């Protein structure tokens, strides 16, 4: 009798499990189909500014400054994001000698030309934490002595072209409205509300939560062995494009980094120092662009959407070399902290576009001014 009961219970549970799996697969198929239907081309090739964006931008500025105040370290005011640098290093960006004429735009207009640059490598968090903690990793590249009119009036005469990137191809927010909500939740210490702002399931951003979790990846072996993406789009002459900087070990001497002690708080800085300063081995990258195909789902205004390489491949426009150097000194680290990077430190040919870049224009400038003013008062 007892044996019969357990057999029937096992049979019933097996059927229930099969039904659950079937329903799960059906739900996944329906969700995938709906997502594919919603996210199909063509898309706009021009910016589309939603109503209320300016007001939301002002709210975001105040929240970003609040975060700067919260994460003040000792007597210095840090960035509201990517506060901890692994170092600022000198670099050279050489345009390909045989660059396709269609790709000769802006700072890439002259084949073979070499730009002197500064590269800042960083963790993504607003608070300096151990490198072993899961986090985004950033690269900012500042080309120097770039001729032409700068987009920002305050930048005239500085001759800079910045590329700002981090190590994931898409962002965990779509637009300014979502960014305002996300950063406000983080500033209030209520991170769960960043993706689940209310009990209304229609407001839940589960897909964006998974993007955020993927962004908070385990630490790389070295900042020099990581691929970085612009996430947001830019003009590339008359085209729209995203950028990527990827390691290019074939262009540098063969090198195997000694195993680092990842229990140390700054092991990524140590790894960079080991390669460039101790072993005197350069690091090499390629700088690539991905041009928008407006007939495919490659939107300008939604940074949570990854532009698929099957729709538009990345094309190499330049090689980036970080020569062997000494960079980890108190004076150089202070100079690194005082540097400002922004997508809007740019010439017209590489104008930032899309909502997140419009937001950056105001927020980066306001936070930079606030931070440098407060630090100058110390």
Please report, for each region that a protein language model flagged, where it lies by residue.
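N-terminal Sec-pathway targeting helices
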Residues: 4-25
């Amino acid at each position: 009798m007892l044996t019969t009961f357990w057999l029937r219970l096992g049979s019933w549970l097996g059927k229930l499990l099969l039904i659950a799996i079937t329903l799960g697969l059906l739900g996944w198929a329906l969700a995938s189909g709906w997502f594919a239907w919603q996210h199909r081309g063509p898309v706009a090739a021009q910016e589309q500014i939603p109503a209320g964006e300016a007001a939301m931008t002002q709210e975001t500025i105040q929240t970003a400054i609040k975060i700067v105040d919260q994460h003040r370290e000792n007597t210095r005011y840090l960035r509201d994001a990517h506060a901890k640098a692994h170092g600022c290093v000198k670099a050279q960006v050489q345009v390909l000698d045989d660059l396709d004429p269609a790709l000769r735009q802006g700072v890439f207009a002259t084949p073979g030309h070499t730009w002197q640059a500064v590269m800042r490598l960083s963790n993504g968090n607003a608070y300096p934490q151990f490198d072993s903690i899961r986090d985004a990793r950033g690269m900012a590249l500042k080309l120097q002595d770039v001729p032409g009119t700068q987009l920002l009036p305050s930048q005239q005469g500085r001759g800079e072209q910045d590329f700002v990137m981090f190590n994931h191809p898409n962002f965990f927010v779509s637009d300014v409205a979502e960014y305002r909500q996300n950063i406000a939740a983080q500033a209030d210490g209520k991170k769960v509300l960043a993706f689940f702002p209310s009990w209304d399931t229609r407001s839940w951003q589960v897909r964006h939560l998974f993007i955020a979790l993927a962004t908070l990846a385990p630490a790389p072996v070295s900042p020099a062995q990581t691929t970085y993406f612009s996430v947001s789009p830019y003009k590339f002459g008359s085209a729209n494009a995203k950028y990527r900087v990827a390691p290019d070990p074939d262009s540098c001497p063969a090198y195997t980094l000694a195993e680092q002690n990842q229990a140390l708080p700054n092991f990524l800085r140590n790894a960079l120092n080991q390669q460039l300063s101790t072993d005197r081995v350069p690091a090499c990258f390629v700088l690539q662009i991905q041009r928008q195909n407006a007939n495919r789902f490659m939107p300008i205004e939604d940074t949570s959407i990854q532009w698929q390489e099957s729709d538009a491949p990345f094309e190499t426009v330049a090689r980036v070399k970080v020569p062997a150097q000494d960079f980890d000194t108190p004076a150089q680290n202070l100079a690194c902290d005082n540097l400002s990077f922004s997508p809007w430190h740019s010439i017209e040919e590489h104008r930032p576009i899309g909502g997140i870049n419009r937001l950056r224009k105001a927020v980066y400038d306001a936070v930079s001014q606030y931070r440098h003013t407060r630090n100058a008062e110390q």
